[in-house]
């Protein structure tokens, strides 16, 4: 199929035109298209096979998402939205927004926008991805009173979403201009790119298991699991392993390609998830010891306490959290929260090293530093939570 497409593209055809020609000339693709026609017509046998295979896939997805701590408010299946898309395409055809070729296929002429012709319906009447995305977008805006829709999809689909926005606008949907394609870069391993076609793709479940295993091994070597039960140790390994994976990826501007290094991500020093998690656990240890000593943090710290430059800096960093979250939202950049959280714990660790907390003789200063520690921990927990990363109460 790829060779056929390359040949047709060399003849000056657009990518969609070359793909359509290649599919028509490929026996295997012809069989697949025949099945698609039967599927859209509701053929019982084809629908039965499709449902069985989809259930296998959904079960696997659910297992992976659960392990990652990911959930969705609502899932839109293309099989439930393609009819909406076909209806809108036919409306666009009737209004002259689109045109039909001799083979019956429906296309959009986007040359005025500096693009090429885009296939919307095949000659046999079956839908394509663009048709389905038109239908899905329409349903989403109908179901929810949203101002903006963000598609989190790799940068390989930049053209697709540029076209989708234009088509929706042509069809009269004002919100078509408000579609945002959050175009993220690709993740590579030290050995090279992950490509499914070349068999170098890394299974998400295998990667998570590897990260958890590495986290457990590293934590044991550093004595961070000492005194814990087996169940507690396993839970810490899970939290640290998945936290390392998520943080290492999220700390990089998502628009850039990156190399994921499993060993580097587990390091308990530097800009890593485990370093932040360990600092949070350290603060929780301080708070537990303070509580055991009968120290109660007042709702308001008494005025008149002389603060060091380091303490004033920490207070300002904690106060900056809301602005950081706002900026991250405006820029569609979780990395802003990730790196802010790292900078905060780095400053706290320096404070922890340079100043007495529980051993401070001045009672008012001691209570202030404990309260400051508690507020740093709160912000760390909230920041990591926004990144989908758990923080352990002990380590």
Segments predicted by a language model, with ranges:
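NTP-dependent nucleotidyl-transfer catalytic core
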Residues: 1-395
């Amino acid at each position: 199929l790829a060779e056929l497409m390359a040949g047709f593209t060399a003849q000056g055809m657009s990518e969609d035109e070359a793909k359509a020609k290649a599919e028509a000339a490929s026996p295997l693709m012809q069989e697949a298209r025949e099945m698609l026609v039967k599927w859209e017509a509701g053929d019982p046998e084809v629908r039965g096979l499709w449902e069985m295979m989809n259930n296998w896939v959904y079960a696997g997805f659910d297992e992976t998402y659960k392990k990652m701590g990911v959930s969705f408010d609502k899932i839109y299946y293309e099989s439930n939205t393609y009819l909406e898309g076909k209806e809108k395409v036919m409306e666009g055809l009737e209004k002259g927004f689109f045109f039909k070729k001799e083979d019956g296929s429906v296309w959009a002429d986007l040359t005025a926008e500096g693009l090429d012709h885009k296939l919307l319906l095949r000659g046999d009447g079956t839908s394509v991805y663009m048709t389905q995305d038109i239908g899905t977008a329409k349903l989403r805006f109908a179901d929810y009173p949203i101002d903006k829709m963000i598609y989190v999809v790799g940068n390989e689909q930049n053209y697709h979403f540029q076209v989708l926005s234009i088509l929706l606008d042509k069809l009269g949907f004002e919100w078509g201009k408000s579609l945002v394609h959050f175009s993220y870069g690709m993740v590579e391993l030290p050995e090279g790119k992950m490509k499914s076609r070349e068999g170098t793709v890394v299974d998400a479940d295998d990667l998570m298991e590897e990260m958890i295993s590495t986290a457990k091994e590293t934590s044991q070597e550093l004595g961070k699991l000492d005194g814990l039960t087996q169940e507690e140790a396993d839970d810490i390994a899970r939290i640290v392993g998945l936290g390392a994976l998520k943080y290492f990826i999220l700390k990089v501007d998502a628009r850039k390609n990156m190399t994921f290094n499993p060993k580097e991500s587990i390091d308990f020093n530097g800009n890593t998830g485990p370093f932040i998690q360990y600092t949070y656990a350290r603060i929780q240890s301080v708070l537990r010891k303070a509580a055991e000593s009968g120290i109660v943090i007042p709702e308001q710290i008494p005025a008149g306490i002389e603060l060091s430059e380091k303490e004033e800096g920490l207070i300002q960093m904690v106060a900056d959290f809301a602005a950081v979250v706002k900026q991250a939202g405006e820029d569609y950049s979780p990395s802003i929260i990730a790196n802010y959280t790292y900078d905060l714990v780095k400053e706290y660790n320096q404070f922890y090293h340079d100043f007495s907390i529980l051993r401070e003789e001045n009672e008012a200063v001691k209570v202030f530093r404990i309260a400051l520690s508690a507020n740093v921990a709160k912000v760390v927990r909230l920041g990591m939570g926004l990144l989908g990363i758990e923080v352990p109460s002990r380590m």
